[in-house]
From Swiss-Prot:
Taxonomic lineage from the root: Bacteria, Bacillati, Mycoplasmatota, Mycoplasmoidales, Mycoplasmoidaceae
Recorded coiled-coil stretches: none
GO molecular function: DNA nuclease activity; metal ion binding
Family recorded in the similarity comment: Belongs to the metallo-dependent hydrolases superfamily. TatD-type hydrolase family.
Binding site for a divalent metal cation 1: 11, 13, 97, 212
GO cellular component labels: cytosol
Name used for this protein in its record: Uncharacterized metal-dependent hydrolase UU017
Record InterPro entries: DNase_TatD-rel_CS, Metal_Hydrolase, TatD-like, TatD/YcfH-like
UniProt entry tagged with the keyword Transmembrane: no
Regions crossing the membrane: none
Cofactor binding: number and manner: Binds 2 divalent metal cations per subunit.
């Protein structure tokens, strides 16, 4: 079944509303188009669902964690999360999405977030899994922690920031995953031209692509619900930006995804 897969959406959420209601149809359309999925949990419930979904087909895998915006019951959730990982280790690609989010200042204290970020890092090391990181307005703190703890296997999810941060992650040997945001129309305010430069300096063996569906729908579907199979719009955009064929770009992205994620051939 995996031999038909041509590309992998490395970060997607068919385990949450509204996509969970369309799961069977989404998976059928993805398989028909040769698209594998890494289904990502953001809390205990969606992590449980991600595992249940990933068990259904070999071209699906999943990531589990507690998102930095969902730490309200973290003490109990984290204990249950580790039990979930231990019992389902073969179906889990990485620990995520976890990390730091300073965008919503009213959510959680920075030190509190950093503590649980470190706990997720410990979990990833214990179970020998990569990290899938959500870092928003917090790159400096995240980089400091990752260096302090000598973290090696990391995917920077949904990277839309400065070229300088991309360069630091590249120097640390991390994978960078680009979302449909890159297909949006450049303006003076969205700094997309700088993001294009980040893509251009990302080594071809460290570049990944994602939808973050149902969010961040790429052009030409922007304004609609995002679906995992829209990942092809983003991969085509990257191919055009880098001046290579879409077929070659998909091959590169697939090889990278299979290298860092847990897909059983």
């Amino acid at each position: 079944m995996l031999e038909k897969i041509k590309i992998i959406d490395t970060h997607t959420h068919p385990n949450i509303e509204p996509l969970i209601e369309e799961f069977d149809d989404i998976i059928f359309k993805c398989y028909e188009q040769g698209i594998g999925l890494n289904i990502v949990g953001v809390d205990l419930k969606t992590s449980q669902t991600a595992i249940q979904q990933a068990k259904k087909f070999k071209f699906l895998t999943c990531s589990v964690a507690i998102h930095p915006n969902d730490l309200h019951n973290i003490e109990n959730d984290f204990v249950a999360l580790e039990k979930l990982i231990a019992e389902n280790i073969d179906y889990i690609s990485c620990i995520g999405e976890c990390g730091l989010d300073y965008y919503h200042e009213q959510n959680y204290d920075h030190d509190f977030q950093k503590h649980w970020f470190k706990k997720h890092i410990e979990l990833a090391k214990k179970y020998h899994k990569p990290l899938m990181l959500h870092i928003r307005n917090a790159h400096d703190d995240a980089i400091a922690i990752l260096k302090e703890l000598a973290v090696q296997d990391v995917i920077i999810h949904c990277f839309t920031d400065k070229k300088e941060y991309a360069q630091q992650y590249i120097e640390m040997g991390y994978y960078i995953s680009y979302p449909g945001v890159i297909t949006f129309k450049p303006t003076k305010n969205n700094q997309l031209h700088e993001l294009y430069e980040a893509i251009k300096i990302t080594p071809l063996d460290k570049i990944l692509v994602e939808t973050d569906a149902p969010y961040l729908t790429p052009v030409p579907k922007r304004g609609q619900t995002n679906y995992p199979y829209y990942v092809l719009y983003t991969s085509a955009f990257i191919a055009n930006l880098l001046g290579i064929t879409h077929e070659k770009m998909q091959k590169i992205l697939l090889e990278n995804s299979l290298r860092i994620l847990n897909f059983k051939k």
